[in-house]
């Protein structure tokens, strides 16, 4: 029984998905009250003795409350456990913004238990603020101003709370290429101006633990020097992960935790480490050594989702103080990281104090109610009832904006189990605040029935009565423990109740009693289940006109098939045994070219209903009937000697009949026969009417054809020779005329111009002088 404590508030948490009138109980293989409760949120169990009749299964006891009452089950005998919620309020004297402190839920599968959570924003709640600054060279002006901020930051916190503390940390990037220049000289002084004193690059340095000493803040921050790196994105997510993962080193208290992230550029995230050959995923653990993140070159950057989970787990609210050009980038980041804000930082960070105050007021005035990770068997939904009259229903987390100090808001939390669960707990909290609600979850799957009875008259003295059902002793089975197993196992007994080695006993519609199926009595009116394996019934047959087998007048259903009365036929007894609609004018059923089914012709392929007379796509059988036509009409052809036997199915008509098919084919002598085919009832049965006259064409004159062909060839040859001779003569004549013209043009004398004398005379000039 559920514990009864006067100091606990008991809330009924049944949240049905449908109204009572539309509730249904879908049950399958139900034999106990627990099985029934697990079947659905609307199922109830009747524990009344002898509630089930002969052949009725124990699952009859499982139904909706309304159905059980209508079947005669007394209301006191109906077992219907409900999901419940018990809450314990916060202890007096403790400042709590979230109540109640503890909730115990008893969950029935499919039914939700609901309870209210109240949040009241307190004034002056303690705050820890950690200032995380980008020390890349582009932030040189900002560092000079931040060094003077210690007193202003604490004064700003004291305006909000009586207990405020501040801390400081800085970051640059991983110290490998391509993120920083790894040249030894550049590692000593990464700044572009060599005259400027800079510190070597680093991933994250924890400078000052959270403190309320503003002088110490200014002293420690004043010692910081600017640094530098190569690429534009910085290693800020690496630093934020260490701030969240190292609570003892940072000095976080269990109060409101703010992380101010100041930068003028973007950020590296998971996967970027591969550029520097860093392949190991970020493990989300603390790796500070001497206040330095020395393992940064061993682990990749964290993903945004991983960082968001770690910040929420550590209850840290980030405030991104970024320059104007980066505001939109970090606004996208706040959509993924809950309870985070963005503020526009001036170029020299002079407005950082006002930025933090504005962001804190924005964060603290919005409340997100959420829970830690749950198994798939538990579902949680939130209804938010905010002070500004805004309501949200069935959301994955509670959400209220514009929450004012000391003005309570209410969230209704609904928890549903999808099955009978093990005892477990989970925590609900308002993100960014320290208070939590512990929820303890217990299963509500057992029925508180009357105590078990060993009444011999009910269970034959061989078992006990539990929730109206006999639980038999070893060696006995049956509804009233009437069957003795004689040492046989239940598997052996059930084997004879399975059809064709099926895994379902008695087709799922009966109980195996002493190795035989006892079929259930169906909930469906007039339905009877029968058969050796309860495989048959009288309703699962084809229907006609909305009735099984067309109704009792047409036929009855026997084990899935209709048995029709004498006047009807068909798979659903939908047809009258008549052929009137299938007879043609000659009284032949479907013209002999089909079968009559349900008084409608089912024609042979090609023929068309309603009477299978026409076959538009069938080939004309003219050529096939040409031999019979020739022998019947002209007593000649290939069938002339046995015409009556070969053409007995074809009748010769003396006069033409309209509507026949005209044919024109050659006979055995080459003459054309013209005849008309008229189809009779049946396939390939025709009458034929033949024209009296044949069209015989005289044969060709072979001698004339041959003589003409030879003569034509000879004449063509002679003509071609004459043409060739004429062309040759014309060509020779043209050449002769050209020769005559050339001869007339020549100027030759009697000497041959080509002749050269064989003697040469040479005159000596000196001979003449002498």
Swiss-Prot record:
Locus of motif Cell attachment site: 397-399
Membrane topology: Single-pass type I membrane protein
Segments forming domain I-EGF: 449-482, 483-535, 536-574, 575-613
Residue numbers of Phosphothreonine PTMs: 759, 761
Signal sequence range: 1-22
Binding residue positions for Ca(2+) 2: 173, 229, 231, 233-234
PSI domain: residues covered: 24-74
A GO CC annotation given for this chain: integrin complex
Protein family per UniProt: Belongs to the integrin beta chain family.
Record's subunit section: Heterodimer of an alpha and a beta subunit. The ITGB2 beta subunit associates with the ITGAL, ITGAM, ITGAX or ITGAD alpha subunits. Found in a complex with CD177 and ITGAM/CD11b. Interacts with FGR. Interacts with COPS5 and RANBP9. Interacts with FLNA (via filamin repeats 4, 9, 12, 17, 19, 21, and 23). Interacts with THBD.
Designated name of the protein: Integrin beta-2
Gene name of the encoded protein: ITGB2
């Amino acid at each position: 029984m559920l514990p009864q404590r006067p100091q606990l508030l008991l809330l009924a948490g049944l949240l049905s998905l449908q109204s009572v009138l539309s509730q249904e109980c879908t049950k399958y293989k139900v034999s106990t009250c627990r099985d029934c409760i697990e079947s659905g949120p609307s199922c109830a169990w009747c524990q009344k003795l002898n509630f089930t009749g002969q052949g009725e299964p124990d699952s009859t006891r499982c139904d909706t409350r309304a159905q059980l009452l209508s079947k005669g089950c007394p209301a006191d005998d109906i077992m219907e456990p409900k999901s419940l919620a018990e809450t314990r309020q916060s202890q007096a004297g403790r400042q709590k913004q979230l109540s109640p402190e503890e909730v115990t839920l008893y969950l029935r599968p499919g039914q939700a238990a609901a309870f209210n959570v109240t949040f009241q924003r307190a004034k002056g709640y303690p705050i820890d603020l950690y200032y995380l600054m980008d020390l890349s060279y582009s932030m040189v002006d900002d560092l000079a101003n931040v060094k003077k901020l210690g007193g202003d930051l604490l004064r700003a916190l004291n305006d909000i709370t009586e207990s405020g503390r501040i801390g400081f940390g800085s970051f640059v990037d991983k110290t490998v290429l391509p993120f920083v220049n790894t040249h030894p000289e550049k590692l000593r002084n990464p700044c572009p101006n060599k005259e400027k004193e800079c510190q070597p690059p680093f991933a994250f340095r924890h400078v000052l633990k959270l403190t309320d000493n503003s002088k110490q803040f200014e002293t420690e921050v004043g010692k910081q020097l600017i640094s530098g790196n190569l690429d534009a994105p910085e290693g800020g997510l690496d630093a934020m992960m260490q701030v969240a993962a190292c609570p003892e080193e940072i000095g976080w208290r269990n109060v409101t935790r703010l992380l101010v992230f100041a930068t003028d550029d973007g950020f590296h995230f998971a996967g970027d480490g591969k550029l520097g050959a860093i392949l190991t995923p970020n493990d989300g653990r603390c790796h500070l050594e001497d206040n330095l993140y020395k393992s940064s070159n061993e682990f990749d950057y964290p993903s945004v989702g991983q960082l968001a989970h770690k910040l929420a787990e550590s209850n840290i609210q980030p405030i991104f103080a970024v320059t104007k050009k980066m505001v939109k980038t970090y606004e996208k980041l706040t959509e993924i990281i809950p309870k985070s804000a963005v503020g526009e930082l001036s170029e020299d960070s002079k407005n950082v104090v006002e930025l933090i105050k504005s962001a804190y007021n924005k964060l603290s005035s919005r409340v997100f109610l959420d829970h830690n990770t749950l198994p798939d068997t538990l579902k949680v939904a939130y209804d938010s009832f905010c002070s500004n009259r805004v309501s949200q229903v069935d959301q994955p987390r509670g959400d209220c904006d514009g929450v004012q100090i000391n003005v309570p808001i209410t969230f209704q939390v609904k928890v549903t189990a999808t099955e009978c669960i093990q005892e477990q707990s989970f925590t609900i909290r308002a993100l960014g605040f320290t208070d939590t609600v512990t929820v303890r979850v217990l299963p509500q799957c057992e029925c508180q029935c009357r105590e078990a009875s060993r009444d011999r008259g009910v269970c034959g003295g061989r078992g006990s009565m539990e929730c109206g059902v006999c639980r038999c002793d070893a060696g006995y089975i049956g509804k009233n423990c009437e069957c003795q197993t004689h040492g046989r196992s239940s598997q052996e007994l059930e084997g004879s109740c399975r059809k064709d080695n099926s895994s379902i006993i008695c087709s799922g519609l009966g109980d195996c009693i002493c190795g035989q199926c006892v079929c259930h009595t169906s909930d469906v009116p007039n339905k009877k289940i029968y058969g050796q394996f309860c495989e048959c019934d009288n309703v699962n047959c084809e229907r006609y006109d909305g009735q099984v087998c067309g109704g009792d007048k047409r036929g009855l259903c026997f084990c899935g098939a209709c048995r029709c009365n004498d006047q009807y036929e068909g798979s659903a007894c939908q047809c009258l045994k008549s052929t009137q609609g299938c007879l043609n004018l000659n009284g032949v059923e479907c013209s002999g070219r089909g079968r009559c089914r349900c008084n409608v012709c089912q024609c042979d392929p090609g023929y068309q209903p309603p009477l299978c007379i026409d076959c538009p796509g069938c080939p004309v059988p003219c050529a096939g009937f040409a031999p019979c036509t020739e022998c019947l009409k002209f007593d000649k052809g290939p069938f002339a000697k046995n015409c009556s036997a070969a053409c007995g199915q074809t009748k010769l008509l003396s006069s033409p009949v309209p509507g026949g098919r005209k044919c024109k084919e050659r006979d055995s002598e080459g003459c054309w026969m013209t005849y008309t085919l008229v189809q009779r009832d049946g396939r390939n049965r025709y009458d034929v009417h033949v024209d009296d006259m044949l069209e015989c064409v005289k044969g060709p004159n072979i001698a004339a054809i041959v003589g003409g062909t030879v003569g034509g060839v000879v004449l063509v040859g002679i003509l071609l020779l004459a043409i060739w001779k004429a062309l040759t003569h014309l060509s020779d004549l043209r050449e002769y005329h050209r020769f005559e013209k050339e001869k007339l043009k020549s100027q030759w004398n009697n000497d041959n111009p080509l002749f050269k004398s064989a003697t040469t005379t040479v005159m000596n000039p000196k001979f003449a002088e002498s």
